[in-house]
């Protein structure tokens, strides 16, 4: 890439091949133009990632114009594609690893019509390290190495077969590992055979890295729906709503959630801490000089009050659970709430999918912890066990803020590009996509938004977003916004994905890694190497230490290179 503040040029290489390995055509710049047009015309699920980034694209997607030539993506020649952006985006290059920006050959697209991109190997063209050989639903996926791939020397595994696993037989993975069918097997600490597996592989059970997913508890500050509730009177509803609007009350809950106990319900006690996360933006997501993002957030957080002193925001440990702090904050909140006529106990409805046993156990763990810390004469957690459809409809798939039928919910967010804004902007008070989880509408609830300070949060985001030349200053400003979010406790960070146990013959840290895009996901096998014997803890830990050191240097180098080529 030759990047600048409002545009970038990308040079092309490689050729298209069919599933049989036959050459189809060269990859050309026009294929990238066709790719965006195809995604736009077919309402691609990730369109929001680029819709307001590329000049003219939003007008095309929303129907203001049907002339795609007005969109800021052009083929300058056969091998150079140019993107014109609507605004400066220092993180633009990291967006290009998302499939929404991948190329599509127009001739092939027309030949396949509605069959394009279906689940048959011949429905797409290939120019990556592998060709899809077979896809059998709920059975297996098979890949073979693409011999024509430009970087084929770095692809050491000739064939890949993925077996379908629905989680019902947790002993199956280790059986297939021992028989040689699997190169990697998940190990489940809560399964019936874990003790036996641990005894046999005590030196070989290793834990995956935490990923980019951030899970958290969040409050609904403007609840309108009460179809699933334990509350029996309007007074109880009003008391809960007033309590949730009180920052001391929210902070009390934040300090009272035992995240380790919650995680243990699905990950087991031994692995419970390995998936914990204390920030919305992963603490090592970006570097600010010689400090991690999380370290800078910590320095900002203490400015909000002494209760935040000594808080460790690193991953894989609970930075918040503190019974004494929780009770002190609750005492402050109770005085303030009683002066407003609030009656106790405060009833908090928390929905959960009743078919997800781990989730039910987790919510019951939260109930037990909070009622123990505060006493059930002060707070009662009412776990609402709902059908899968009902749970989706009151939470993740709720059509509007007013349909969110809960007081407290467990939700999550995944970053799309290498900038803190990907985690923080969705909650801005003007047009944030996920403002709705608080039960808020940007236009209808301005007064409530201001009373919560979300207008201040939005101002912090704007100030950070306006800094496009000095990356360190930009990230530091976003750290201020993250600190505000922690102090406000509308969102209470809890855990990530990853941190899971396995036995494996995959040589540690030989596969690609990225917190954004598809290049670092679990289905990228370029660079990966296998070894004869299972990986040991010692081997894994030594490789991890070396990788972390090299990763930090690579991030610093990348940020310096960005600063040097801004036009």
What is each residue range found by the language model?
Residues 25-108:
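Surface-exposed binding/hinge segments that line
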Residues 176, 308-415, 551-554, 558-565:
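Ligand/substrate-recognition segments at binding pockets and active sites
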Residues 1-7, 12:
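Single conserved hydrophobic/aromatic residue that forms the stacking wall/gate
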Residues 133-148, 163-232, 260, 264-269:
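Extracellular/periplasmic solute-recognition and catalytic clefts
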Residues 68, 78-79, 84-161, 172, ...:
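Gly/Pro-rich hinge or "lid" segments in bacterial periplasmic/extracellular proteins
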Residues 8-9, 32, 81, 128-130, ...:
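Short, well-ordered beta-strand elements
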């Amino acid at each position: 890439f030759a990047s600048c503040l409002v545009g970038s040029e990308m040079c092309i290489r490689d050729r298209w091949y069919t599933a049989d390995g036959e050459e189809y055509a060269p990859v050309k710049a026009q294929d990238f133009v066709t790719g965006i047009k195809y995604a736009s015309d077919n309402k691609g699920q990730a369109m929001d990632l680029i819709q307001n980034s590329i000049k003219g694209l939003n007008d095309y997607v929303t129907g203001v114009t049907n002339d795609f030539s007005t969109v800021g993506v052009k083929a300058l020649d056969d091998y150079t594609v140019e993107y014109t952006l609507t605004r400066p985006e220092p993180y633009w290059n990291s967006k290009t690893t998302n499939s929404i920006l991948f190329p599509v050959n127009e001739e092939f697209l027309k030949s396949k019509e509605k069959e394009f991109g279906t689940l048959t190997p011949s429905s797409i063209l290939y120019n990556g390290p592998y060709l899809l050989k077979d896809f059998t639903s709920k059975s297996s996926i098979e890949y073979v190495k693409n011999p024509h791939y430009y970087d084929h020397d770095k692809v050491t595994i000739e064939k890949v077969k993925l077996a379908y696993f629905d989680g019902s037989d947790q002993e199956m993975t280790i059986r297939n590992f021992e028989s040689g069918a699997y190169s990697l097997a998940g190990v489940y600490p809560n399964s019936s055979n874990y003790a036996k597996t641990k005894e046999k592989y005590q030196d070989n059970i290793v834990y995956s890295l935490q990923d980019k997913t951030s899970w958290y508890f969040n409050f609904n500050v403007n609840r309108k729906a009460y179809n699933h509730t334990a509350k029996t009177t309007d007074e109880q509803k009003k008391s809960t709503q007033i309590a949730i609007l009180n920052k001391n009350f929210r902070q009390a809950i934040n300090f009272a959630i035992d995240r380790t106990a919650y995680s243990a319900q699905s990950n087991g006690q031994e692995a419970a801490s390995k998936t914990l996360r204390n920030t919305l933006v992963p603490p090592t997501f970006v570097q600010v000089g010689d400090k991690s993002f999380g370290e800078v957030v910590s320095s900002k957080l203490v400015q909000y009050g002494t209760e935040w002193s000594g808080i460790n925001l690193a991953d894989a440990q609970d930075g918040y659970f503190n019974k004494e702090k929780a009770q002190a904050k609750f005492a402050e909140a109770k005085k303030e709430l009683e002066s407003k006529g609030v009656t106790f106990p405060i009833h908090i409805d928390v929905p959960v999918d009743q078919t997800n046993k781990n989730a039910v156990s987790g919510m019951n763990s939260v109930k037990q912890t909070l009622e123990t810390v505060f006493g059930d004469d002060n707070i009662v957690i009412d776990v609402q066990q709902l059908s899968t459809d009902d749970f989706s409809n009151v939470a993740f798939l709720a059509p509007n803020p007013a349909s969110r039928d809960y007081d407290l919910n467990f939700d999550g967010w995944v970053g799309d590009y290498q900038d803190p804004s990907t985690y923080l902007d969705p909650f801005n008070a003007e047009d944030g996509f996920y403002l709705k989880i608080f039960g808020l509408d940007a236009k209808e609830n301005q007064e409530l938004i201001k009373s919560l300070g979300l207008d201040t949060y939005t101002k912090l985001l704007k100030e950070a977003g306006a800094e496009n030349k000095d990356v360190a200053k930009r990230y530091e400003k976003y750290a201020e916004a993250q600190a505000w979010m922690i102090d406000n406790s509308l969102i209470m960070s809890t855990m990530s994905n990853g941190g899971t146990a396995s036995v494996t013959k995959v040589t540690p840290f030989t596969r690609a890694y990225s917190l954004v895009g598809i290049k670092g996901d679990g289905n990228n096998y370029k660079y990966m190497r296998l070894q004869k014997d299972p990986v040991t803890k010692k081997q894994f830990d030594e490789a991890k230490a070396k990788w972390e050191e090299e990763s930090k240097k690579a991030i610093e180098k990348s940020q310096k290179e960005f600063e040097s080529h801004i036009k």
